[in-house]
Amino acid sequence: MSTLDKNLLLEMFRKMEEIRRMDLKIAQLVKKGKVPGMTHFSVGEEAANVGAMLALNPDDLITSNHRGHGQAIAKGIDLNGMMAEILGKYTGTCKGKGGSMHIADLDAGNLGANGIVGGGMGIAVGAALSQQMQNTGKIVVCFFGDGATNEGVFHEAVNMASIWNLPVIFYCINNGYGISADIKKMTNVEHIHQRSAAYGIPGMFIEDGNNVIDVYEGFKKAVDYVRGGNGPVLIESVTYRWLGHSSSDPGKYRTREEVELWKQKDPIENLRKYLIENTIASAEELEEIQAKVKEAVEASVKFAEESPFPPLESAFEDIYAD
């Protein structure tokens, strides 16, 4: 049994519920034609995001990828602002200019998602260099998928971070597929984290990325190592996305049996059972959290739908840094 504090465990449950319910609601809005642009969902990957994020300090920084909804929520984005952003509204966290694939929240330390595969890696290295030069004590976490590790920028970013001993964690959420390509057909190493050896930095493997406690405890060790001035770490967490690569992907390259097998490893249900069986929380407590999250998600939709679209003159706003 874990020795983690009850409040932390309940926060894990709440955050994962927020990710699941927000993404399923956004998927409904996509089908209604209310969401401009492409969307990529984090359903099934909740533990891999939440366990990592709760191991950080609130003022630590992250860079995200195209599948950034879960990371944004886990980092503490305002749900109203997020939903408004995804619907392209002026009240969104990026004033409707970012949308789903470029969701960002600088107030929460989220430097932004990125529509380019691996695009956040160089940004993370720059942010980590900034923290090192200013001696802030903050660290940076770069989120990316398994497919991004075959991009040239992966080598460039990890190599530079290792040379300069930067306070950055490279975090690969391995869901097994780069769009429709099985990762086993795309790389010759058994596990992504083994690539750390080429750069002389530690590699960490979280085998069950659907166990939020395992993710948290593993990630916390890496956070303490990096914050201690020891340089970067490469972490791999194995999980699975329940939905297609994007809102336009029917997922025909996977069998129903494979998807159902992973659904039996539901990270939220796993934590719910753990909390109840170990008498950490009652079913009623968890149901109350679920009800409040559902209410907050519905409120975010109402806020977003009632918000205005950006005025034409806003196209000339935020071009330069103040």
Predicted regions, residues:
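Conserved acidic/glycine
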Residues: 1-48, 54, 243, 247, ...
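Short acidic, gly/pro-rich beta-turn/loop elements at beta-sheet edges
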Residues: 72-74, 180, 245, 314
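Cofactor-binding active-site loop characterized by glycine-rich and histidine/acidic residues
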Residues: 24-28, 34-164, 182-188, 193, ...
